[in-house]
């Protein structure tokens, strides 16, 4: 069932069920003294509040409303009180000044339906000992500078496999599905870090199945759902999100259990590496699972792998696809990026990660992609752990807080020509995506900043540089750059609605 028809169904149900909410409405009216200090927002309809204004692309709908009601805006979705942040100044307040109070999580029904919020490093509150333990494990075993450096050769190998696939497609003059190809590359990088195996192949359906599963889960987790606004309706599963999410995550859990069982069997035979540096992520987790005082059980491991797998694969491949789409739509920008690489690297070379620091225009292209197409347009929803004042307005306890980084990246008061893809805006400017410049925070900030940020930036930059250095690119079937659509499909991760196909043309001067 699509979003629009699903919304119509639950709006009708809301009307029929309104009698159950009379007491809630009355309590809200009795609290009018505090409401005077709430951020401004659009008028609310009885019972449903502002649900009718969400639309199928909430990040865009909220951006339009913010033009009227300001950079900190109150919305009510059924029983759910929300505040939407739409300026760098307000984002700083949330992500830095009041980070501790606003670092809770507001999980949705599709996350709660399989108990993920109770064991997930993404959804647990930072105040919990379990979150601190899982966060430490994630950083130490996967995202630390030492681990990132240790997997550099792996990234290089997998990106060269991508280039080889593009070479074969170029020889056949075939258009390539950029999303599928980039996902296969990122999938194999992440699966080797986690399990020491390739899970994807460029000439099989396996990668496609994984990508469809992960994208389906991210969309189910992110799209509007009646149960998020009226929790008592969750058991009805009006839009089928619970059923979809349980089915999708169970597929991934089966894969994880297979690897866990295989590694446990190998270890029982003594076939495992005693060299810590050679252990993959799952090896290290299973060691922590041993003994009577184990820090983790199998359920913890499955859910942690789910966090690492979904967040690590989908976001990076989506960003690469958006970057290629923008460059194909702006061919002069592509030529400029390629000219920089030819000048710096010369000919008949292979792009190394160490080369990226000497390619400022390429880095600007990546930043510009993050600005216009942040992987998580509203970040992951935060929750106020207590009442807190933000820019002079009261954000009550338990309010959902959404930081609309998509809208901030397109704010004309912050960016000149905000809708245009212009990497030049970053040249000579010390602006990065590390959570310190609040006009550009695609990975969040504060204690909730994405720990995989360095790995993601390295992976996307190396993939993009390698594709631009080795190939020229053209659109298939006579499509001209001006006609390339940039429609979006909303979820926790923001995807292109329509598949991006492009034909790689091998450069004659590159071996």
Curated annotation (Swiss-Prot):
This is Cytochrome P450 76C4. GO terms for molecular function: 8-hydroxygeraniol dehydrogenase activity; heme binding; iron ion binding; monooxygenase activity; oxidoreductase activity, acting on paired donors, with incorporation or reduction of molecular oxygen. The keyword tRNA processing does not apply. Pfam families: p450. It is an enzyme of class 1 (oxidoreductase). Heme binds at residue 450. It comes from Arabidopsis thaliana (Mouse-ear cress). The chain crosses the membrane at residues 3-23. The gene is CYP76C4. Belongs to the cytochrome P450 family. Keywords: Heme, Iron, Membrane, Metal-binding, Monooxygenase, Oxidoreductase, Transmembrane, Transmembrane helix. It is a single-pass membrane protein. Its cofactor is heme. It is found in: Membrane. Its main location: membrane. Its EC number is 1.14.-.-.
């Amino acid at each position: 069932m699509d979003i629009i028809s699903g919304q119509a169904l639950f709006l009708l149900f809301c009307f029929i069920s309104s009698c159950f909410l009379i007491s809630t409405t009355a309590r809200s009216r009795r609290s009018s003294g505090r409401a005077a200090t709430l951020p401004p927002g659009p008028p609310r309809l009885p019972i449903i509040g502002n649900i009718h204004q969400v639309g199928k692309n909430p990040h865009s709908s909220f951006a339009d409303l913010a033009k009227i009601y300001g950079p900190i805006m109150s919305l009510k979705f059924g029983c759910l009180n929300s505040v939407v942040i739409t300026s760098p100044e307000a984002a700083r307040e949330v992500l830095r000044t009041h980070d501790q109070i606003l670092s809770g999580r507001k999980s949705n029904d599709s996350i709660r339906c399989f108990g993920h919020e109770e064991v997930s490093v993404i959804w647990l509150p930072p105040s919990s000992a379990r979150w601190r333990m899982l966060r430490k494990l994630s950083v130490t075993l996967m995202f630390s500078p030492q681990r990132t450096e240790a997997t550099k050769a792996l990234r290089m190998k997998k990106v060269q496999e991508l280039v080889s696939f593009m070479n074969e497609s170029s020889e056949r003059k075939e258009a390539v599905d950029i999303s599928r190809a980039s996902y296969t590359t990122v999938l194999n990088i992440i699966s080797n870090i986690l399990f020491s195996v390739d899970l994807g192949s460029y000439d099989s359906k396996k990668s496609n199945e994984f990508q469809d599963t992960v994208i389906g889960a991210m969309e189910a987790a992110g799209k509007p759902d009646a149960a998020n606004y009226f929790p008592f309706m969750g058991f009805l599963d009006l839009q089928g999100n619970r059923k979809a999410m349980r089915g999708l995550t169970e597929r991934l859990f089966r894969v994880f259990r297979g690897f866990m069982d295989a590694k446990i069997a190998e270890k029982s035979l003594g076939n495992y590496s005693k060299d810590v540096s050679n252990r993959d992520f799952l090896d290290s987790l299973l060691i922590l699972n041993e003994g009577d005082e184990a820090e983790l059980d199998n359920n913890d491991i499955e859910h942690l792998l789910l966090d690492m797998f979904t967040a690590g694969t989908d976001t990076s491949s989506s960003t690469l696809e958006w970057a290629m789409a923008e460059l194909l739509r702006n061919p002069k920008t592509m030529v400029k990026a390629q000219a920089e690489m030819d000048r710096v690297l010369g000919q008949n070379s292979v792009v190394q990660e160490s080369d990226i620091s000497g390619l400022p225009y390429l880095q600007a292209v990546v930043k510009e992609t993050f600005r216009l197409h942040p992987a998580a347009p509203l970040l992951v929803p935060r929750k106020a752990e207590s009442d807190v004042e933000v820019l002079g307005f009261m954000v009550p306890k338990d309010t959902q807080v959404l930081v609309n980084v998509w809208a901030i990246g397109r704010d004309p008061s912050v960016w000149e020509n905000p809708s245009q893809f212009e990497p030049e805006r970053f040249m000579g400017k010390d602006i990065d995506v590390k959570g310190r410049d609040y006009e550009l925070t695609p990975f969040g900030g504060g204690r909730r900043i994405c720990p995989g940020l360095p790995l993601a930036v390295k992976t996307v930059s190396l993939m993009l540089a390698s594709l631009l250095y080795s190939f020229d690119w053209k659109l298939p079937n006579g499509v001209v750059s001006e006609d390339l659509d940039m429609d979006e499909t909303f979820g926790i991760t923001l995807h292109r609605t329509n598949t991006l196909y492009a034909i790689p043309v091998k450069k004659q001067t590159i071996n």
